[in-house]
Design a protein with these regions (language model features):
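C-terminal cap/substrate-recognition subdomain and adjoining C-terminal extension
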Residues: 77-100, 104-301
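Short, intrinsically disordered C-terminal tails of secreted or membrane-associated proteins
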Residues: 314-319
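Alpha-helical substrate-recognition element adjacent to the catalytic core
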Residues: 1-131, 228-230
Length: 320
């Protein structure tokens, strides 16, 4: 839940797709058509198409190229500041909040975004690399159903992707490090539905977000409320100003009518005009972790007025 949840569009559209001379529509059509023709998983076929396209254009899918691309990912409004605010809100009440990523995007890109240090663990697709550091095969493919395995890993405190034994061992509910009832899952659409339903049905909360700059983007999420798959629907604007103006009210649960064209976010103008990346670039220095001074803002009236934080706290964290 990174693309469309914390950042608009798909991360492959920033640098890779323009670099191979394809439009966003062409690349995703080819990948999905391959999946249909071969009756294959769409995540695996998009990863395979990346390798095929790079080879055909003489590009090198180096880890460093993905990392460089991650440093240029554009986030939704307020995302950078969100973590400090919600962490401070929890700390003021003796609650430690942990953040995880569970995404069908590329881990190599996500791990170099400016908010990567905020996450305890990033579960996402990744490649195997040869001795020269060039991607040659998918290592992890995270689709809409196997995303749920990572929810169980988080629940049981299993952080390794490789480990398949501990996650299947029986652990009493009250002894699990992260109980389902304490989980809040934030996602943007169909690839998150199984996880949203799992978390909600297990006593946690699921929140669906949409790109506020895409017309009628909210409408296709109304069915999630109707079908009792999510607890809350709101725009993907994490800024404090937005919250204070009331955009994250409980009223946002109420349904509208109509529909939204599928894949609207995929062709978002936010990602269509990026410059192609040279896939032989060198890695840049890593980001320093931000020091969060939670004590100074525990009693901040702006935080107390933050409607979305209040929603999460009053409807979830208080009901354990």
């Amino acid at each position: 839940h990174f693309d469309g949840t914390l950042a608009p569009g798909n991360m492959q559209e920033y640098d890779f797709i323009p670099a191979v001379g394809k439009s966003n529509k062409e690349f995703w059509h080819d990948a999905n058509q391959l999946a249909e023709e071969q009756d294959a998983d769409m995540v695996l076929t998009y990863m395979a198409r990346m390798i095929q396209e790079a080879r055909s254009k003489g590009l090198s899918l180096r880890r460093e190229a993905f990392q460089e691309s991650g440093r240029r990912v554009t986030l939704y409004k307020g995302v950078r500041e969100w973590f400090a605010r919600i962490n401070a809100y929890g700390a003021a009440r003796g609650i430690r909040i942990l953040h995880y990523i569970n995404s069908s995007g590329l881990k190599e890109i996500i791990a170099e975004t400016e908010i990567a240090h905020e996450f305890r663990r990033i579960y996402a697709c990744s490649f195997l690399y040869d001795i020269d550091g060039v991607a040659y095969w998918p290592a992890v493919a995270v689709n809409y159903t196997n995303k749920t395995q990572f929810i169980f890993k988080i629940n049981k405190g299993v952080e390794s992707v490789f480990d398949s034994k501990l996650v299947n061992q029986y652990i009493e509910e009250d002894k699990r490090p992260v109980p389902f009832r304490r989980m809040i899952y934030v996602g943007d659409g169909t690839t998150d539905i199984p996880c949203m339903r799992l978390v909600k049905n297990s006593g946690g909360h699921s929140i669906a977000v949409y790109n506020p700059e895409i017309r009628n983007a909210r409408r296709e999420l109304n069915g999630l409320i109707r079908d009792n798959r999510v607890s809350h629907v709101c725009p993907a604007d994490y800024s404090d100003r937005r919250f204070r103006n009331g955009y994250a009210r409980q009223d946002d649960h109420r349904q509208d009518r109509g529909g939204s064209p599928a894949g609207a976010a995929r062709n978002s103008p936010h990602v269509a005009q990026r410059n192609p990346l040279r896939f032989d670039g060198k890695p840049s220095p890593g980001f320093r972790k931000n020091t969060q001074h939670t004590q100074a803002i525990r009693n901040d009236p702006e935080i107390r007025r933050n409607r979305t934080i209040r929603y999460v706290y009053e409807n979830h964290l208080c009901n354990q």
